[in-house]
Amino acid sequence: LAIGSFGIGMTEFVVMGLLPDIARDVLPAVWAHSQDDAIAQAGWLITLYALGVVVGAPTIAGIAARFPRHLVMIALATALTVFNALTFVLPSFELIAASRFLAGLPHGAYFGIGALVAADMLGPGKRAQGVAFVLTGLTISNVVGVPLGTFLGQQYGWRIAFIAVASIFALATITIALFVPKHPGDPGRTITLEG
């Protein structure tokens, strides 16, 4: 679970250090006219990811409550693998922007459901340690992963950072499948908006 939160930290924040590289590559006409405008336009990749988080967190968490948590976590980590791999291969700014929005969708649900899974795995008296363990991946990502991803992206092309992130999520998917215990869903649980 912490491996996935490490990947989430990387995919969310590595873009910031690579905006000039991304803008130069996928917005060449804008870059030729104004580098500042190209970087500002590339900044939409950050905004669209954040929008995906806002839309996806409550939607996915609500829908996923009915299904076994280990399967939901596998699905979320798989989605993060695929959407980051798409960012690596897609040729145009518009398609990359769409992949960034899609990559943001599982973000909040991964943290929310992952924290519940970790708390259940450790049981009473150690639930907070389980939640902290999941969030440790995010902390380590901000200290190690993002600078490393930015360095790799600047040295070998910005896309390498996203295939690295996709690889991290692939590893997270495998470890979740192997080590997260089965937990039944709650078929009766739904989201309601009372007001």
Give the positions of each predicted feature.
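Helix-loop-helix hairpin linking two adjacent transmembrane segments in secondary transporters
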Residues: 95, 124-129, 133-181
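Extracytoplasmic
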Residues: 3-28
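Cytoplasmic helix-loop-helix junction between adjacent transmembrane helices
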Residues: 93, 99-137
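MFS 12-TM fold signature
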Residues: 79-84, 103, 168-172
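Extracellular/periplasmic helix-loop-helix junction of adjacent transmembrane segments
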Residues: 20-54
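Residue-level signature of mid-helix packing/kink "hotspots" within the transmembrane helices
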Residues: 13, 49-58, 142-143
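Conserved MFS/SLC helix-loop-helix module at the cytosolic interface between two early adjacent transmembrane helices
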Residues: 55-91
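Juxtamembrane intracellular "pre-TM" segments in multi-pass secondary transporters
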Residues: 181-195
